[in-house]
Design a protein with these regions (language model features):
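A glycine/proline-hinged amphipathic helix-loop "lid/cap" segment
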Residues: 1-71, 313-325
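Short beta-strand element of the alpha/beta-hydrolase
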Residues: 78-87
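Short amphipathic alpha-helix adjacent to the substrate-entry channel of hydrolases
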Residues: 96-115
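Alpha/beta-hydrolase active-site loop
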Residues: 124-146, 304
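Gly/Ser-rich "nucleophile elbow"/oxyanion-hole loop immediately N-terminal to the catalytic nucleophile
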Residues: 141-156, 176
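Hydrolase active-site cap/lid region
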Residues: 171-227
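Short beta-strand/loop motif that positions the catalytic acidic residue
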Residues: 249-251
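Catalytic active-site module of serine/aspartate enzymes centered on a nucleophile-bearing elbow/loop
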Residues: 294-325
Length: 325
C-alpha cells in the first residue's frame, strides 16, 4: 500500500513526515534510538507514586525491571491491576515513555499499573520479551494482595509491539491456565511477521513502514525460519481464539498493521469473544501518541479511555485458585 501525503489527515501530515525523516529503518538507527529512549529509565510521573522492583523472568537467572504506578492517594479497597507493555518494534523503548497514559488510566479508574522493561530484540530475540511480560502478569497475580490489587480484575494492555506482546501474553495465560485475564487492550498490535497483507506490502507511510516492519521482525525472530515462528511470537498465527478475554483495540487505516488487526478482531468475534473495535481513517501508525491534540487523536484516546473505564466497571475473571464472590 503506497501512501501519499494527501491520503493522510491534514492534522497529522507535518508531524508524521518529520517523525519519518528522523526514525530510519536501519539496525544502526534502531540501536541509536534505543540508547536515546533508555535515558528515560527511572524517571517518575509527577502525579503518581512510582516504585521499581526486579522480578524473575520465566527464563532462569534473568531479572526484569518493572515500574509500578499508582495514585498518591491510596484507596481503601483493592483495585484492578494493569500490565502495560510499551511499544518500540520489539527493539527499543522503556516503560517510562508512557507516563502520561498511566496517569490518565489511574485518573479514570483507580488501578495499579505494572510496566516491565522487557528485554529487547537487539539484545535477546524471541522468546525473551514475551517471557518477561508473561512473568510480569504472573507476578502481579501472585502478589496482588501486597500490591492492593484485585486478582479478579487483571487487564493486559499495550501499544504496537506492546500490543503484540499483550496478545501473546493473553494466549499464554489461556494456554497455561495459571492466570485469568479479565480484559485486554492490544492497540494497533504488531502480530503478523509475514508482511503479506495489502496494508503491509509496500507500505511507505510515515512512522512505521514495511521496511521498519521487516527489520523489527527480523531482529525479534532471530534465526527462526518462516515455518518455525510460533503463535507466542506472532499471535496472528494462532488458529484457536476461543476463551480469550474480552478485547478492545483500534488501528489507523494507513497503518501496516491495519489488516492483521482487522483479521485478529474477526477471529476473536468468530470465537465468541466480545470485541470493541475502531478503524480511524487517514491515520498512520501511532498517530494517537504523535498528535494526541489532533481531532482524530483525541477521538482515539477517548475510545481507549471509554473502553478501559467500561472494563473496570464490568469485566471480572476470578482466578482458578480463588473462590468466587
Amino acid at each position: 500500500m503506497r501512501v501519499t501525503r494527501d491520503m493522510i489527515d491534514p492534522e497529522l501530515r507535518a508531524a508524521g513526515v518529520a517523525f519519518g525523516l528522523l526514525f530510519r529503518p536501519s539496525e544502526w538507527f534502531f540501536r541509536f534510538a534505543r540508547r536515546v529512549t533508555a535515558r528515560a529509565a527511572g524517571s517518575s510521573v509527577a502525579g503518581l507514586d512510582c516504585d521499581e522492583r526486579r522480578i524473575p523472568s520465566l527464563d532462569p537467572d534473568v531479572d526484569v525491571r518493572v515500574r509500578i504506578y499508582r495514585s498518591k492517594t491510596r484507596p481503601s479497597e483493592s483495585v484492578p491491576g494493569v500490565v502495560f507493555l510499551h511499544g518500540g518494534g520489539y527493539a527499543l523503548g522503556t516503560p517510562e515513555q508512557n507516563g502520561p497514559l498511566y496517569e490518565t488510566l489511574i485518573g479514570l479508574r483507580s488501578c495499579v499499573v505494572v510496566a516491565p522493561d522487557y528485554r529487547k530484540s537487539l539484545d535477546a530475540p524471541y522468546p525473551a520479551a514475551v517471557n518477561d511480560c508473561y512473568a510480569t502478569l504472573r507476578w502481579l497475580k501472585d502478589n496482588a494482595a501486597e500490591l492492593g490489587v484485585r486478582d479478579d480484575q487483571l487487564i493486559v494492555m499495550g501499544q504496537s509491539a506492546g500490543g503484540g506482546l499483550a496478545a501473546a501474553v493473553t494466549l499464554m495465560a489461556r494456554d497455561r491456565g495459571e492466570v485469568r485475564v479479565a480484559f485486554q487492550l492490544p492497540l494497533y498490535p504488531m502480530i503478523d511477521d509475514r508482511n503479506a497483507t495489502d496494508s503491509a506490502r509496500d507500505n511507505d507511510a510515515p512512522v512505521w513502514s514495511e521496511k521498519h516492519n521487516r527489520l523489527g521482525w527480523r531482529l525479534y525472530l532471530g534465526g527462526l525460519a518462516a515455518d518455525e515462528v510460533p503463535k507466542y511470537a506472532a499471535p496472528a498465527r494462532e488458529t484457536d481464539y476461543a476463551h480469550l478475554p474480552a478485547t478492545a483495540t483500534f488501528v489507523g487505516d494507513l497503518d501496516p498493521f491495519r489488516d492483521e488487526t482487522i483479521q485478529y478482531v474477526e477471529n476473536l468475534r468468530a470465537a465468541g469473544v466480545d470485541v470493541e473495535f475502531r478503524l480511524f481513517e487517514r491515520c498512520y501508525h501511532g498517530f494517537d501518541g504523535i498528535r494526541p491534540d489532533s481531532k482524530v487523536g483525541r477521538e482515539a484516546n477517548a475510545f481507549v479511555a471509554e473502553q478501559f473505564a467500561a472494563a473496570v466497571d464490568s469485566r471480572f475473571a476470578p482466578q482458578a485458585d480463588r473462590p468466587k464472590g
